[in-house]
């Protein structure tokens, strides 16, 4: 009985804290502007690096969402060293400009092959792409950083890396190199150190082989996945591209479930948060109903699911309302399961600050230090 009472208190506090955070998030103009670009080496010497980002993308949302006050953050990705990106571009490409819609970003990242046989590493071209293609904030107080992740000789290619760094610095962009360790490359490590020194950043190192595994600690991940799938089925797609977006919702769940069950929980929290809820009126009938209760009558029935397209208007309205309340119920059940796990982990002493040298841990640690310097409280786990 006492354990149940403690759980209810813990759940109340969690919901109270979460609601406070979403209030701040809704007032984005008052938050600290943070632009983060991951500039990734996708050559053979960095095979597997892309997995470090895409498998932990939701870790970044989870980190930022628990900061107080919540920053006005955006994430973008530039990649280099793939021949498919074109010699004229220095084998570099902007994968996704700065933004907050992480689901399409995740979808794009999982389409990139993680391994190739070779590739030319033109770091200067990669940074030039960050300079010319990324829509950096004009806010003079913004934190604007590039996590330059890779290895090899930084002087290769036609771009003058020093001149490019000067132009980035003039825009207030700081480079934080993260070197992927390769035996016998002491000379190139010094080059990466020089980038950090000249840009005002700090050099870190990681091993791409490093991985950490989720501690389920008795958590019923299969039951959680079943709830999550039911939650996804409350989304009623419509319109041009509606089915594609609904499929993306499910695909990204499957991707992260296979690779990182901790990230799977973070993504579930994202989907029940104010960052996602009522934000999909362009393709979901339930969110459209929130926006305009009669707008569903004007949608093209041919774009609906087989179940919905056969319904009369009054039946479809009733079905939308049913799915609306089912979504609320499932959101609460998902939150309950996560809160119960967090309480159990805390009681069992399973909550620790992550220290392993992986891309997500190193970069989040850097972000924490930068935000704390701006008097923003950030989580340590």
Regions found by a protein language model. Give the residues of each.
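Von Willebrand factor
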Residues: 30-144, 146-147, 155, 184-189
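C-terminal "exit" segments of structured domains
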Residues: 199, 203-295, 331-360
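Acidic/histidine-rich, surface-exposed loop or edge segments in extracytoplasmic proteins
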Residues: 30-45, 105-111, 171, 299-302, ...
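DG-centered beta-turn motif at the end of beta-strands
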Residues: 41, 77, 127, 143-155, ...
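VWA/integrin I-like adhesion module and closely mimicked acidic/polar interface patches used
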Residues: 152-198
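Bacterial N-terminal signal peptides
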Residues: 9-17
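Solvent-exposed loop/turn segments at secondary-structure junctions
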Residues: 42-46, 80-86, 114-117, 151-156, ...
């Amino acid at each position: 009985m006492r354990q149940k009472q403690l759980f209810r208190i813990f759940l109340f506090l969690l919901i109270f804290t979460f609601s406070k955070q979403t209030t701040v998030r809704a007032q984005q103009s008052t938050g600290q502007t943070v632009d983060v670009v991951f500039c990734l080496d996708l050559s053979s010497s960095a095979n597997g690096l892309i997995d470090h980002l895409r498998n932990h993308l939701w870790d970044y949302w989870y980190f930022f969402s628990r900061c107080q006050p919540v920053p006005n953050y955006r994430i973008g990705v530039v990649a280099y060293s793939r021949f498919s990106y074109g010699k004229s571009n220095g084998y570099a490409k902007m994968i996704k400009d700065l933004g907050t819609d992480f689901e399409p970003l995740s979808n794009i990242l999982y389409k990139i092959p993680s391994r190739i046989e070779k590739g030319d590493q033109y770091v200067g071209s990669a940074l030039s792409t960050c300079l010319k293609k990324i829509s950096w904030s004009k806010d003079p107080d913004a934190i604007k950083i590039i996590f330059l992740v890779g290895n090899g000789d930084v002087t290769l290619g036609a771009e003058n890396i020093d001149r490019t760094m000067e132009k980035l610095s003039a825009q207030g962009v700081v480079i934080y190199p993260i070197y992927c360790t390769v035996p016998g490359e002491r000379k190139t490590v010094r080059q990466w150190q020089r980038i950090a020194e000249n840009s005002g950043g700090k050099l870190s190192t990681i091993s791409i082989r490093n991985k950490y595994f989720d501690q389920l600690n008795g958590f019923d991940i299969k039951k959680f996945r079943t709830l999550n799938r039911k939650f996804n089925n409350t989304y009623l797609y419509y319109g041009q591209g509606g089915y594609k977006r609904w499929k993306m919702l499910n695909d990204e769940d499957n991707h992260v479930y296979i690779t990182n069950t901790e990230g799977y929980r973070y993504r579930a929290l994202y989907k029940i948060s104010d960052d996602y809820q009522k934000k999909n009126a362009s393709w979901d009938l339930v969110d459209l109903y929130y926006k305009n209760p009669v707008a569903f009558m004007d949608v093209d029935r041919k774009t609906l699911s087989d179940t919905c397209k056969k319904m009369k208007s009054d039946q479809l309205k009733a079905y939308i309302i049913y799915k609306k309340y089912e979504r609320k119920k499932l959101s609460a059940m998902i939150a309950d399961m996560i809160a119960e796990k967090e309480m159990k982990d805390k009681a069992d002493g399973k909550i620790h600050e992550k220290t392993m040298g992986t891309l997500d841990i190193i970069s989040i640690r850097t972000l924490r230090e930068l935000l704390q310097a701006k008097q923003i409280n950030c989580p340590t786990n």
